[in-house]
From Swiss-Prot:
Keywords: Amidation, Disulfide bond, Ion channel impairing toxin, Knottin, Neurotoxin, Presynaptic neurotoxin, Secreted, Signal, Toxin, Voltage-gated sodium channel impairing toxin
Disulfide bonds: 50-65, 57-70, 64-77
Species name: Cyriopagopus hainanus (Chinese bird spider)
Alphabetized GO MF terms: ion channel inhibitor activity; sodium channel regulator activity; toxin activity
Subcellular compartments: Secreted
Protein name (record): Hainantoxin-III 1
């Protein structure tokens, strides 16, 4: 009887500790998420010298990034397949 009470109490303590730890991690999650969003936002502020997929371009000017080509039909950069 004493052993089962001890195990039940130990289980409750373990459950409390795990719940507290996961709750404290959840409180830190929004801060980490916001810091990552702002870090990505800072990266987007830098301008590239070339145009990426779906950006408008002028055929024949070679404005698209490597592995992309300006489509003469649609006038936007798309993946260059080598044809």
């Amino acid at each position: 009887m004493k052993a089962s009470m001890f195990l039940a109490l130990a289980g409750l303590v373990l459950l409390f500790v795990v719940g507290y730890a996961s709750e404290s991690e959840e409180k830190e999650f929004p801060r980490e998420l916001l810091s990552k969003i702002f870090a990505v936002d800072d990266f987007k502020g830098e301008e590239r010298g070339c145009k990426g997929f779906g950006d408008s371009c002028t055929p024949g000017k070679n404005e698209c990034c490597p592995n992309y080509a300006c489509s003469s039909k649609h006038k936007w950069c798309k993946v260059y397949l080598g044809k």
